[in-house]
Structures are given as structure tokens and as C-alpha cells.
Amino acid sequence: VMPKSCLNTECIKDMTVLHGEDGAYQIAFKDKHKTKIKIEVKGDICEYVSVYSVGNVPVMLATFEEAENDPNYISKEPGMYPDMLNPVVDGEIEATGSYQSLWVRVDKKAPPGLHNITVKLSSESEERVCCMDYKIIDISLPESDIVYTQWFHADCLAVYYNVPMWSEENWSLIEKYIKTATGYGINMILTP
């Protein structure tokens, strides 16, 4: 959801996943007042639900000249693009006054069955409730033998977090990032 979106899409109120796979969906919203928004999750599988605020990051080069005619880009202009998932801490986020979204993730360990996930967003001025009928079919896909490789720059973690390279703090960060990567199916890393 781009900050300057003009959303006219229909709400999807149900989704289906297979047992053993993560599921996720977005909730788009706009609060004209720059205020705190309280996020509350209810339902019989809420212990398997994580909510993230989708943060925007600056993009200076959205596409190369060779791809100018490719229709599959959200936008080809520099700007702020939704990319970073920030865990919702203490059930609150800050409204920006433009369109924002929440990323609602359901862990693959959630039990099979038909579940209702309710996410309530409330601010000083209004309250909205988003309900999702979330069906988990009791069938699992076989383990994949696909090798999913991504670059991993441990030196960048040390620079970003301002910790000494190869220090205990750096190794702790490396461990956390690799654990997160494996949670998203990455099973091989390339290091420079």
C-alpha cells in the first residue's frame, strides 16, 4: 500500500492455506489525524498471529531504463515504498496521515480448521474492525528440496547497529537475522 494510494479495492474477508504453511494478509487504513492507533487481535488462534506495521523506505532508483516499458512495477518513480515490517509493540502504532498498512501473519503451527481473526484498530476519533475467516486445510505439502539462497552481509549488520565487527553483539545479531531468514524459507546464504 503506497502512502499516496487511492484505495477502491474490495475487502477480502476469507482466505485458505494448507496446514504447515505461513499465511499473511494486509489491512490498509488511513487516519487523517497523526495520532496513536491501538491494535487489538482477537480469535481462537490469536497466539499464532503476529502483526507488523509496514514501514516505508526511500527508493532513489525504482527501475532501470531498460525496464521502462515493463507494466509489472508498482511505480517507476523515486519515492517512499512500503517494505520494512516493524513488529507492533505494546499494541500501538503512530498514524502518519497517509495510507498505511498492517501485515498480519499467521504462523504455520496454527491448527487446522476454520478460524476467525479479528483485528480492531482504534484511535481517538474512530474505531474499525477487520474480520478474516481463516481456513487451514488439514493437508500438508511435502518438504521442498528447493535451495533458496540470499545474500547475507554480516559487515552491514555491524555498521548499521554500530557494534564492533565479530564481537559478541555482532554474532548475536547474525544469529537473529539467520534465524529470521530460515523462518521465511531461506535455507542457504551467500556471504561476500
Predicted regions and their residues:
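Residue-identity detector for threonine
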Residues: 9, 16, 35, 63, ...
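Surface-exposed binding patches on compact interaction domains or structured appendages
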Residues: 1-10, 22, 32-104, 111
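Solvent-exposed, low-complexity, repeat-rich "mucin-like" stalks and linkers
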Residues: 12-37, 167-172, 176-179, 184
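N-terminal basic, low-complexity leaders that serve as flexible interaction/assembly modules and, when applicable
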Residues: 3-5, 16-17, 58-63, 67, ...
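Extended acidic/polar, glycine-enriched regions
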Residues: 28-38, 90-146, 171
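Sequence-level detector for tyrosine residue identity
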Residues: 25, 48, 52, 73, ...
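An acidic-aromatic substrate-binding cleft motif
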Residues: 129-192
